């Protein structure tokens, strides 16, 4: 959790880093009393590893510029508390208006979440004024397409109407296979959609096969098997051919020989003012939703000048939260239900400029600039090309056809900037049958098998709910890829195109489950909170909070000695000698009885008290924290994790700060969340050299502004 901080002797919370620091407390939509479902892999460790790679890249960039090394402090806890998978935006929600997110029942949101179909399950999201009318026509309910009862937030639609629509939806789904339902939803309703696939489905899918997503590697002990090939593709500095896993001690002599050689001499640059690693790098940002903006947030945090290019003639999807503005009363009603995935407003008040006040957007908009231009028009493209000529990097994560129609592909921009680095982050890549499929992280994770493997072993996919770990990982890996491309350009003068398919980027995280299929032909199935060799390995209920809310602790026992210590702390030492639980093998064979026995005992304890008692005995455990508990975490407070930041519209709010520390590169949030068009004058006049007359023409044609054009934002009468 980071050195020298208030939680001493903490063994890694092996399966619940995402619970103690992140959003596991919200996962799983089963009936009250059922444990949360963890991610389907050791996600916190992998995500922390990706953060470590990015942090190392930042340190290398600094070293190459100054000759000075650095010390990097990464806390797995911090990486989860700051993750885009709901933890960071939900903490911003809480700062804005006190929302405490809650778990909710499966199927409770209209046209969203996992549903059964003819040959399995799909996850389709078709809510909102952009998609819902087309969705209703698609499922045979055209008479409801303009129904005013559906203009309220999805969670406030009358239950009778929801049930009526869901019945038609069910009938439609049961006449279609997974592939058919996803394809028709994508093509007819432009819905966000993905199948919930098994490892077998994934490995056999022609989309990934055609894109070269698998790599056959031979090993002397396991033979040839297919592995995930690469998280992203770099056109000018491709990843070397993967090598097999080494045998134990295979390279000892080679490493010792290299270690005996003198280190290369490095010339330190003259001492000067403190600089962040990416100072002087200009990044043009055409990103939407979460993964892309998160990538550019990380780059901006470490010094890059990130300029968002945003239209005022239309609302970008799921970005500034302005597709449809709710009233203050509607916001408060949704907040009282613990539901605010799309963000909320300070004190629930949308104000005059709700697009600047959305907590979801603002949680990743710090340290950035904003200019406005409609790049789908000739004038807007001309301005965009002029900006690109001054830039180092362009980042986008749109549906590929959107970028192609706007004529801002890498090939079309090269004449304006031959050394440009362009990062493209589509859901499923720039080629293949799924190229133009629309998806959020949760739909991508369904398509690649993560939703399947993280489900409850005895349950159904709708019960495990939605997670957005793909967005978080995509943002981190995208920033890392850009950092590597910048190093390559510094050495060679060569820019390049980086293609980061968010689906393929996640495949290495599922390596264990994928290799179980490719090596053994074994489907691991939904794993819930189970572990192959550890028991107990579960989230257990503890004493409810003072206001009656559920409270949970994750416990991970690897050895019989740890189990004995657990039993003593729980006041039931006799359990350790019970024949059903005396050995790990016995506990794994009697999991239901074990979980029932341990859960009955943990209910008597406060989760924080039990956490500290178990840690003091060497038992890996961690409380599943709510948003308010993370805000008041003495550990995060001691590490200076939260920062109080101002913005003219949303005021002073608390946000998660940077989540690793470099000893010789101190870093804080330097600028509050950027407002729409806030930097138009600077970008157009100073950077691009527009004259007063040129600038006036763009203003008159509706490109330049700080509010959306008349009629673009849909407001209810009383908003």
Functional labels for PLM-detected ranges:
Residues 70, 279-281, 496, 551:
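Nucleotide donor/acceptor-binding cores
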């Amino acid at each position: 959790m980071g050195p020298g901080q208030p939680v001493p002797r903490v063994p890694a919370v092996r399966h619940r880093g995402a619970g103690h620091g992140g959003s596991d407390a919200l996962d799983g939509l089963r009936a009250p009393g059922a444990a949360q479902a963890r991610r389907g892999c050791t996600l916190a460790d992998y995500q922390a590893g990706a953060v470590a790679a990015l942090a190392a890249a930042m340190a290398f960039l600094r070293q190459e510029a100054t000759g000075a090394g650095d010390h990097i402090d990464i806390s797995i806890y911090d990486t989860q508390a700051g993750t885009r998978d709901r933890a960071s935006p939900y903490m911003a929600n809480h700062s804005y208006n006190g929302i405490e997110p809650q778990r909710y029942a499966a199927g409770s949101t209209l046209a969203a979440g996992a549903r059964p179909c003819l040959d399995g399950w799909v996850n389709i999201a078709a809510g909102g004024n952009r998609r819902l009318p087309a969705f209703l026509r698609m499922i045979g309910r055209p008479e409801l397409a303009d129904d005013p009862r559906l203009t309220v937030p999805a969670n406030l639609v009358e239950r009778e109407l929801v049930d009526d629509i869901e019945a038609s939806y069910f009938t439609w789904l049961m006449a279609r296979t997974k592939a058919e339902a996803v394809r028709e939803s994508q093509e007819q309703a432009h819905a966000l959609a993905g199948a919930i696939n098994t490892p077998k489905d994934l490995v056999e899918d022609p989309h990934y096969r055609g894109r070269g997503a698998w790599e056959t590697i031979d090993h002397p002990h396991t033979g040839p098997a297919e592995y995930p090939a690469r998280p992203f593709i770099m056109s000018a500095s491709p990843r070397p051919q993967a090598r097999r896993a080494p045998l134990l001690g295979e390279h000892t002599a080679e490493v010792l020989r290299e270690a005996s050689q003198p280190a290369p001499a490095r010339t330190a640059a003259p001492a000067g003012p403190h600089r962040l690693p990416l100072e002087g790098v200009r990044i043009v940002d055409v990103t939407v939703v979460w993964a892309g903006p998160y990538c550019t947030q990380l780059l901006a945090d470490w010094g890059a000048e990130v300029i968002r290019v945003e239209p005022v003639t239309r609302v970008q999807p799921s970005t500034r939260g302005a597709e449809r503005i709710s009233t203050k009363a509607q916001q408060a009603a949704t907040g009282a239900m613990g539901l605010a995935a799309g963000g909320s407003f300070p004190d629930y008040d949308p104000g005059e400029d709700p697009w600047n006040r959305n907590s979801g957007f603002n949680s990743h908009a710090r340290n950035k600039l904003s200019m406005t231009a409609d790049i789908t028009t000739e004038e807007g493209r001309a301005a965009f090309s002029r900006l690109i000529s001054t830039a180092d990097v362009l980042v986008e994560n749109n549906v590929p056809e959107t970028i192609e129609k706007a004529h801002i592909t890498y090939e079309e921009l090269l004449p304006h900037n031959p050394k440009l680095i362009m990062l493209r982050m589509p859901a499923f890549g720039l080629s293949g049958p799924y190229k133009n499929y629309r998806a959020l992280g949760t739909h991508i994770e369904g398509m690649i098998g993560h939703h399947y493997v993280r489900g409850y072993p005895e349950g159904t996919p709708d019960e495990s709910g939605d997670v957005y770990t793909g967005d978080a990982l995509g943002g981190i890996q995208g920033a890392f890829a850009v950092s590597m491309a910048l190093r390559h350009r510094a050495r060679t003068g060569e820019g390049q195109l980086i293609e980061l398919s968010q689906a393929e980027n996640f495949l290495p995280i599922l390596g264990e489950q994928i290799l179980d299929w490719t090596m053994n032909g074994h489907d691991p199935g939904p794993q819930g909170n189970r572990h192959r060799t550890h028991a107990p390995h579960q989230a257990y209920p503890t004493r409810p909070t003072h206001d009656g809310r559920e409270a949970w602790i994750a416990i991970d026992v690897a050895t019989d000695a740890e189990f004995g210590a657990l039993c003593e702390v729980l006041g039931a030492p006799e359990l350790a000698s019970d024949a059903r639980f005396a050995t790990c093998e016995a506990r794994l064979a009697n999991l239901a009885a074990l979980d029932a026995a341990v859960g009955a005992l943990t209910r008597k304890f406060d989760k924080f008290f039990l956490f500290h008692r178990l840690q003091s005995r060497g038992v890996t455990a961690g409380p599943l924290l709510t948003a308010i508990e993370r805000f008041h975490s003495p550990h995060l407070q001691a590490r200076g994790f939260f920062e109080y930041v101002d913005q003219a519209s949303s005021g002073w709010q608390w946000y998660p700060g940077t989540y690793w520390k470099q000893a010789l590169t101190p870093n804080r949030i330097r600028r509050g969340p950027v407002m729409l068009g806030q930097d138009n004058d600077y970008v157009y006049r100073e950077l691009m050299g527009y004259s007063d007359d040129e600038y006036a023409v763009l203003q008159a044609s509706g490109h330049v502004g700080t509010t959306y054009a008349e009629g673009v934002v849909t407001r209810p009468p009383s908003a």
